[in-house]
Amino acid sequence: MTRSQRLAPLVFLAAIVSLTAMTVRSTRAAAAERTTWDSVYTASQASRGETAYAKTCARCHGASLGGGDESPALTGGNFLGNWNGLPLSDLQKRIKTTMPSDTVGVYDIQLVTDVIAFMLRANGYPAGAAELPKEVEPLKEIIVKAGKPGSQ
């Protein structure tokens, strides 16, 4: 028996063990993923966001978040199609660095985060016991998911 013939079963076993370990890690990571369906904002935060939205965003995006001539809708299929699978930190950054279009960057980060909570409520995501954090790092861990879990 050649050396490669003797080592073949060990190489095969090592490959199986590696694949099993990677599968377990992937399964744990998927199970630990937080999404917008995990009640990531509070009702009072969404209410603050609604007030801020009415004062700062509605003139371009519409009172019902349906969009305007040059501003996209912030609810429904187009919005979810653009943001599905992305972290809320990306949405926060987009708003903070591009809105309002005539005076970019004037919105305080708490206001932006509260408006995101309002947008989540308007898109049918449930409220919870803890506020959506304004810090970027925790928002990187919350993924926008278009479809309600278990509805497929």
Functional labels for PLM-detected ranges:
Residues 1-6:
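N-terminal secretory signal peptides that target proteins for export/translocation
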Residues 10-21:
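Bacterial N-terminal signal peptides
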Residues 27-52:
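Electrostatic cytochrome c docking/interface patches
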Residues 34, 104-152:
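Flexible coil segments in periplasmic/lumen-exposed cytochrome c-class electron-transfer proteins
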Residues 34-35, 70-79, 133-137:
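Short linear capping/connector segments at secondary-structure termini
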Residues 40-46, 65-100:
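Gly/Gly-Pro-rich "capping" loops immediately C-terminal to redox-active cysteine motifs
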Residues 49, 53-64, 115, 119:
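The canonical Cys-X-X-Cys-His
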Residues 63, 97-98, 121-125:
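Generic structural signal for alpha-helix termini and adjacent loop/cap motifs
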